[in-house]
């Protein structure tokens, strides 16, 4: 995931980015302060955001952490040119993700989703498996075509689909990037 984030931060000619579900901040070391004016790290967990601030003091002039619940507070999201959402859509669902993207109004959206070929067991075997017992209540099975259709509905076209990285238990990570379509840019500039 770290290497993927490095690619995501470098991929597009942007100065602002928003990371939805920043968690503990893995991959933020790839933020180049000579490229980015502002990077927003969004998470529902304030302890994660505190850890990010402590872990990356060198980004204090660029990185701004936002404690928000994307399901209920998407209207508080600020605008950015790039949205990065890695392993997040599985937990908030397509409609909430669409709402967040529309609010942020980026030129580019870069997502990593986990594709599960074994639907019955989407959490990896671990001695701590019981800790995930209720995760089924918030986890949404991801499908590449459904995500791309959801993005197309809100005016974004797929521009990149990375090689799938195979993981244990029949899982894979897939990076899919989108760009705002020209028609959508023209329509949104009139509102």
Residue locations for each model-derived region?
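Short, glycine-/aromatic-enriched active-site segment of Class I SAM-dependent methyltransferases
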Residues: 116-138
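Core SAM-dependent methyltransferase catalytic element
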Residues: 161-191
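A short SAM/SAH-binding and catalytic strip from SAM-dependent methyltransferases
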Residues: 81-95
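Conserved beta-strand signature within the Rossmann-like core of class I S-adenosyl-L-methionine
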Residues: 106-120
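Short conserved loop adjoining the S-adenosyl-L-methionine
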Residues: 72-78
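Class I SAM-dependent methyltransferase SAM/SAH-binding core
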Residues: 16-72
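Short alpha-helix
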Residues: 135-155
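Conserved alpha-helix/loop element of class I SAM-dependent methyltransferases that forms part
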Residues: 1-15, 26, 30
């Amino acid at each position: 995931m770290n290497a993927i984030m490095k690619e995501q931060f470098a991929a597009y000619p942007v100065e602002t980015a928003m990371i939805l579900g920043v968690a503990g901040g893995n991959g933020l070391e790839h933020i180049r302060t000579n490229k980015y004016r502002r990077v927003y790290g969004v998470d529902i967990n304030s302890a994660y955001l505190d850890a990010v601030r402590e872990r990356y003091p060198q980004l204090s002039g660029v990185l701004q952490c936002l404690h928000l619940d994307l399901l209920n507070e998407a209207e508080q999201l600020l605008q950015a040119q790039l949205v990065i959402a890695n392993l997040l859509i599985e937990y908030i669902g397509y409609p909430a993700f669409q709402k967040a993207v529309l609010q942020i109004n980026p030129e580019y959206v870069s997502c990593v989703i986990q594709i599960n070929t074994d639907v019955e067991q989407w959490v990896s075997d671990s001695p701590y498996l019981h800790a995930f017992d209720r995760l089924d209540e918030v986890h949404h099975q991801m499908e590449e075509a459904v995500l791309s259709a959801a993005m197309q509905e809100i005016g974004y076209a797929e521009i990149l689909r990375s090689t799938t990285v195979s993981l244990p238990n029949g899982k894979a990570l897939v990076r899919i990037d989108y760009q705002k379509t020209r028609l959508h840019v023209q329509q949104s500039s009139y509102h």
